[in-house]
Amino acid sequence: MTNFPKIGKTPPNFLTIGVYKKRLGKIRLSDYRGKKYVILFFYPANFTAISPTELMLLSDRISEFRKLSTQILAISVDSPFSHLQYLLCNREEGGLEDLNYPLVSDLTQTITRDYQVLTDEGLAFPGLFIIDKEGIIQYYTVNNLLCGRNINELLRILESIQYVKENPGYACPVNWNFGDQVFYSHPLKSKIYFKDLYSPKKSS
């Protein structure tokens, strides 16, 4: 039995076919190592209800992910030709016309199974994995099939991961957004932050 991918560990590699800008090509996860962060964005299947709302918003905000040197790979158990048909359909029909990142085919369900997001019905749970430039898993979530994911939260998490990796010794507190106060990750030093945050405020 495959172990569930763990934070701080190398994710299962894969080589498969993807579709980008209506062209089919090979996609290998390890090719991004040393170059970019990668978001693996699993979704149940093409032409479902929730998936296009997530996938199109990711596409509309692709510039924000590119600024963070991040590649999005959307993965489902559909064939490359199903992906191509999905990309040929316009938004009004629930399609993904002009999508700004690849759709990855996992027709054999190998990738979905390796990442432990395969449903009993043979679809993919809405799983999400953030992999850093060193090829290490830094974050993952798995959602209810009928609950859409929050792209603002995804960007916030991505920025916080990059911040703490680039600034050793610091941590990002609750609801942190880029530019907000950070504090020391050491338990003793972090008390400086707690004192400032929770001490009674003096009235003027």
Curated annotation (Swiss-Prot):
Catalyses: a hydroperoxide + [protein]-dithiol = [protein]-disulfide + an alcohol + H2O
**Oxidoreductase recorded as keyword:** yes
Q: Which GO terms describe its cellular component?
A: chloroplast; cytosol
Q: Does the keyword Oxidoreductase apply?
A: yes
Where is this protein localized, as stated in its record?
Answer: Plastid, Chloroplast
Q: What is its main location?
A: plastid
Picking any one GO molecular function of the record gives: thioredoxin peroxidase activity
Residue intervals of the Thioredoxin domain: 5-163
Similarity field: Belongs to the peroxiredoxin family. AhpC/Prx1 subfamily.
Spell out the protein name for this chain. Answer: Putative peroxiredoxin ycf42
Source organism per entry reads: Trieres chinensis (Marine centric diatom)
